[in-house]
Structure formats: C-alpha cells, structure tokens
C-alpha cells in the first residue's frame, strides 16, 4: 500500500496542487462547499421521506416484514409534504443557488465585488430561464433542481468573468467619497449589471426564436448522445454516471432514458419470469433468461452509498484521513450514505471537480461491475428477481433484490470493502495535496489573481 501511495503522490500531488489553485476549479469547489447547508438539509428530508415515513408495499420497512394499517400509512404519507417542501427549498433549487455561490467564489478569486457578481449570476440564470409551463406563465421546477446544475455552473463562471472584465476596465459609475460606501457599491455594479444582463437577454431571446432555451441545449447535449448507447447500456450507465457527476451534472438524471426506459423494464421482466416459474432454476430449465443489467443490480452491488460507491469513500476517510474538514463531512454524510443518498459527500467534500478524487470516483463503479458480473457468471449470485427500495442499505438491498440470497449480501459487502480499498490511497494523497494548497497565499498568487 505504501508503494501505491508513493506512486500516486508522485503523479497526482503536483497536478492536484496546480489544479487546486486554478481559479475556476477553486470557485466551483468553494461554491459547492457553501451550498452544503442546503444539500444536507435536503438530503436528510429525502432520507426521512423515503425511509422513515414509508411503510407501504415496496418500502424498506415493508421488506423487513413490518406492516401498518392503511390509515396510519396514509397519515405518514401526508407528513411527507413537510419534507417535500423542504426539498423544494433546498435540493430543488440547487441550480438556482449554484451560480450565486460559484460566481461569488470566482469574484473573490479575481479580487472584485463578490456579492455583486453572485447576485448578477442569479439574475443571469433567471434571464435565460423560460417562463412557461404549458400555457401558464411560470418557471418549471425542472430548471431549478439538480438536473440542470451544469447550467448554473457555466453561468456563474461566465458572469463572474464578465463582471471582472468590465470592472477592471473601470466601466463603472464612481461616486464621491462623501457618499456612503453601501450606496457607492450599488452604483458601481450598475453598468456591469446592465451589460451582462443585456447579453444574457439577447441570448435568451435568440434561442427562444429558434424554439429552444439555454438550459435545454445543455441538457440535450448531455443526454441525447448517451441515451443512444443502447447496445452497451449497462456499461454506459456505470461509466458515465460518475463521470457526469464529477463535472457537476446529475448523472442519473441525465441518463434517465437508460434507467427508466431500459434497465427498470428489464427488472420488471425478471420479476415476471420469476413469478411465472417460481424459481430461477425452473425458469432457466425452461429456456428463459434473466437480464443481468437490471437497475436493482446496480443499486445493490455497484452504487454503494450512491453514485461512485461513496460509502466506500466515507469509510476510507474514517480509516485514513487526518483532515478535520474531511472527517466532519464524512460524519455528516454517513447517515444518508447508508441509505444510498450521497449529495452531502458529493457537494460537501466536494468530489465535484476534485482532481484527486477523479480517478477513484470514475473507476470504482466499472471495477465493482466487473466483480459483480464475474460472481454472476460463476454462479455465485443469482439474477435480480425483485425490486427493493433504492434506499435499502448496502447488503440488505442485494439480499432482498435476489429474494433472499445470502451470497448476494456477502458479495455486496465484499464490493464495499473493495470500494474502500480503492479510495484509501487517494484519501491519503488528498491530505497532502490540501496541506500544500493551504499554505499562505504568496504575493505572486495575488498578482496572478488580479490578471485577466
């Protein structure tokens, strides 16, 4: 292990330090860190709604044999409205808040008015957002949530750079020193704001004339090419979900066509075949086949703690990290990670645009998929013949999705151990990389930040 860590340090450490000081990458990282209160609050209520208030058929507690009467279930379902409202105000507006914090963080890197840049980023985001839902004059929630976060990232970075460009050229209104600072500050952002929002308004108008909008173009550019990879759908999903997440794109939502359109129907076909013949052996004897890439297989053996098998990362942090911030994030992310919700670790560490975590985050899922396929074709685990809740903890999900296979439970736990081992050396490297980045800012760094 020490040789592996030494090799990774030699290759990754200089690169990680250099990337860690890159203003745009740093702005994205710091922006997501500031979003963490929203992320954590939203994730907790997703957990409460999908696990602790769910007792109907197909729920976690139902799978454990716990049954409640219909009136109690209806009452609990009604209480989910509380968590739903919190979700709408947290994870449901991630794409709206991302440009504010990212634009603000980049403005701080550039040594210009951060608050003005952040506010203009939000205004620019809403300027290019269509105000129509059917016949109604309204903003669609789909533009504000996690599925559209790449738009928020792009707009936050672009607006902050435009703001910097304008301010550095003194295209601002300057008031006498006798005017209060708060008033002077507001007027200094007037001309930059007018120019930036005019540009965004023209872009929105032009795209609307062509029957589309900025957000839709971003989504189509991501989703359409990947959804066409039907022949290799399983591997495409396993590889591209974490890859998209690394760049701030909600991978699972971007590839919904593969999930809902192909892999979930495969799971339903497996269940129907199992129900018809009563057992996997009887179905195989009758010449029937089962789909290995059914969606619950991914949830059970690959997405351990969420995309990128981040429950393994949390465990690796507890084992190897000495960084107080990493350990605190891991503590906060563990409860939701156990139930397959990993936004706290994705945005809190963050993993997004983190150069040290790129390799393990993207590679861990294909490795776990290969192990799972090997176990399946060797006859160690049976195919998926049930659909347990996606929030089922690691091991239990595999057990229920295979209708009680202990071998499946053990393979899932083995995969979790492998994921932890994959992340371990990178957690150690991250410790040293951050120590180098956290050194006192030099005069040269300040001078570089002021360049455009």
Swiss-Prot record:
Induction: By GlcNAc2, GlcNAc3 and beta-N,N'-diacetylchitobiose (Me-TCB). It holds the Pfam family PTS_EIIC. One of its GO terms (cellular component) is plasma membrane. It is found in: Cell inner membrane. Keywords: Cell inner membrane, Cell membrane, Membrane, Phosphotransferase system, Sugar transport, Transmembrane, Transmembrane helix, Transport. InterPro entries: PTS_EIIC (IPR003352), PTS_EIIC_3 (IPR004501), PTS_IIC_cello (IPR004796), PTS_Sugar-EIIC/EIIB (IPR051088). Its main location: membrane. The chain crosses the membrane at residues 35-55, 86-106, 114-134, 147-167, 187-207, 229-249, 300-320, 344-364, 367-387, 409-429. Residues 8-426 form the PTS EIIC type-3 domain. Residues 56-85, 135-146, 208-228, 321-343, 388-408 are periplasmic. It is a multi-pass membrane protein. Residues 1-34, 107-113, 168-186, 250-299, 365-366, 430-452 are cytoplasmic. GO terms for molecular function: protein-N(PI)-phosphohistidine-sugar phosphotransferase activity. GO terms for biological process: N,N'-diacetylchitobiose import; phosphoenolpyruvate-dependent sugar phosphotransferase system. The EIIC type-3 domain forms the PTS system translocation channel and contains the specific substrate-binding site. The phosphoenolpyruvate-dependent sugar phosphotransferase system (sugar PTS), a major carbohydrate active transport system, catalyzes the phosphorylation of incoming sugar substrates concomitantly with their translocation across the cell membrane. The enzyme II ChbABC PTS system is involved in the transport of the chitin disaccharide N,N'-diacetylchitobiose (GlcNAc2). Also able to use N,N',N''-triacetyl chitotriose (GlcNAc3). This is PTS system N,N'-diacetylchitobiose-specific EIIC component. It comes from Escherichia coli (strain K12). The gene is chbC.
